[in-house]
Structure formats: structure tokens, C-alpha cells
A protein has these predicted regions:
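Active-site-adjacent substructure of cysteine-protease-like catalytic cores
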Residues: 50-104, 197-199
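Short solvent-exposed strand/turn elements
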Residues: 118-142, 230-231
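Short acidic, Gly/Pro-enriched loop/turn segments at secondary-structure junctions
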Residues: 114-127, 148-154
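Arg/Lys-rich, positively charged N-terminal/basic patches that mediate binding to nucleic acids
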Residues: 1-48, 54-56, 142-188, 196-197, ...
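Enriched for short, Lys/Arg-rich terminal
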Residues: 219-231
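Short, conserved beta-turn/loop elements at beta-strand boundaries and strand-helix junctions
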Residues: 20, 113-120, 130, 221
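Residues located in well-ordered beta-strands
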Residues: 14, 106-111, 124, 135
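Short coil-to-beta-strand transition motifs
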Residues: 4-11, 98-108, 210
């Protein structure tokens, strides 16, 4: 019997993160380990038996949908931001959301599993690169002996440069950030949340993070926070 050309996937969970919009989300999972997220199962899958033994793993894979970048069609080539936004590469040589099946794959740290009476087991994760409310279709344990490839070739990503910025912020302004969010927000800002092709030192950028509206400018390797307001 031949396999069907299409299949239906069920959303098993949604993730809660500090990012209500796409802007500012780290470009890959694991870049900001202090970012906290909660994976909350949909009612059908709120079964403690389904996660039995998962607590013995330190990391998990999340299979999710690019729900913030849904298109009716796909493109065989895309322009990765890390290449300046002008060079085209085959979509299957990238992690672009504009693919035939808009699925993402992220490796995150599993900090703990909380069992809550209202929503069942909740996975507390660190280092996710997902927007708040992103639907998750599957999760699997990360298995080091099979999933880790230290000698793997990195393709065009080996040629790109990650900009690690120095963050500068007035102490009084920074005090507006709750203490339990400061490390995560600093990590996001130091990883340069700007689009890779934008380098105007006079431009003021704004991003939403954990109920805050954060504004900043970047000049060279220094990011200066210019405003933090509660939304």
C-alpha cells in the first residue's frame, strides 16, 4: 500500500513565551538560555502518563508551526538575513519559514515538569526561539549520542558573523524590568535583535517583551536602551 501524499497533524500543545510578536525572537534556539517558556498541552493530551520518563532528559526537540509567517505558496529559493538579504539559497538549505510545510524544529532545555490541576503537565523550558502561542505538533527527547554531531559542516552559516553587542542602559530605566526577566532581556538585546540588513545608528527600534515595550539604538557594537515602558 502506498503512503498518502498528505497527512493531518494535530496541535498537541502551545508554548507561552515573552514574545507577542516576531521581532526580537532569537534567530535560533539555545542562543539565550535564560529565556523561559511554558509548553501547555491541549485538553486532549493533558495526560501525565504521556510525559512519564521525560523528566530524565535534559533537552527536548519541539516540532512547531511558523504560525506568524503563514503563506499560501512556497518559494524554492529564499534570501537568508544572515547573508545580508540579497543572496538567494535553496529553501531546503535554510531554516526559512517559507517552505512547503511551514514547520520549525527547536532544541530546548527541559528545566522541569510541573503538574498543575487546571492544565495538567506543563513543560518548563529554556532557550526557545518561539513566539507566544506558537502551536506545537510534536516533541521528542534530545538524545546526545544520536543527535550531537560535533564535526558537522555548517554550510553558509559558517561564513556568517553573529554580532554580540554590549548593552548600555540607565540603572533607573533598567529597574523597570522585573528581576526575573532581566537576564533574558539582556541576552536578547546582546544578540542583536535587529534585522541583519539594518544598520542605521540613528534609528530607534522597538520590541515587545514580557509585557514591556523596549526601545533601543545600535551604534557599532554598542546597544543603548532608550526607553522601557509597561504595556
Amino acid at each position: 500500500m502506498s503512503a498518502p501524499e498528505e497527512m493531518t497533524l494535530k496541535v498537541i500543545a502551545h508554548i507561552r513565551t515573552a514574545f507577542p510578536t516576531k521581532f526580537g525572537i532569537p534567530r535560533q534556539s539555545g542562543l539565550v538560555d535564560s529565556l523561559r517558556g511554558e509548553v501547555i498541552f491541549t485538553p486532549e493530551y493533558r495526560n501525565a502518563d504521556a510525559v512519564r520518563g521525560l523528566e530524565d532528559f535534559s533537552h527536548i526537540w519541539l516540532v512547531w508551526q511558523f504560525s506568524g509567517a503563514v503563506r499560501d505558496s512556497w518559494s524554492p529559493t529564499v534570501r537568508p538575513p544572515r547573508l545580508g538579504g540579497n543572496t538567494r539559497v535553496g529553501v531546503f538549505a535554510t531554516r526559512s519559514p517559507f517552505r512547503p510545510n511551514p514547520l520549525g524544529l527547536s532544541s530546548v532545555q527541559l528545566e522541569t515538569i510541573e503538574h498543575r490541576p487546571d492544565v495538567g503537565p506543563v513543560l518548563i523550558v529554556r532557550g526557545a526561539d518561539l513566539m507566544d502561542g506558537t502551536p506545537i505538533y510534536d516533541l521528542k527527547p534530545y538524545i546526545p549520542y544520536a543527535d550531537c554531531h560535533p564535526d558537522a559542516a555548517a554550510g553558509f552559516t559558517a561564513q556568517t558573523q553573529f554580532h554580540h553587542l554590549t548593552m548600555v542602559c540607565d540603572a533607573g530605566l533598567w529597574a523597570r524590568v522585573p528581576a526575573d526577566q532581566q537576564a533574558a532581556l539582556q541576552g536578547v538585546l546582546e544578540n542583536d535583535p535587529r534585522p541583519s540588513y539594518q544598520h542605521d545608528p540613528e534609528r530607534v527600534y522597538g520590541m515587545e517583551f514580557g509585557g514591556l515595550e523596549v526601545h533601543f539604538k545600535v551604534d557599532g557594537e554598542v546597544l543603548t536602551v532608550t526607553g522601557i515602558d509597561r504595556r
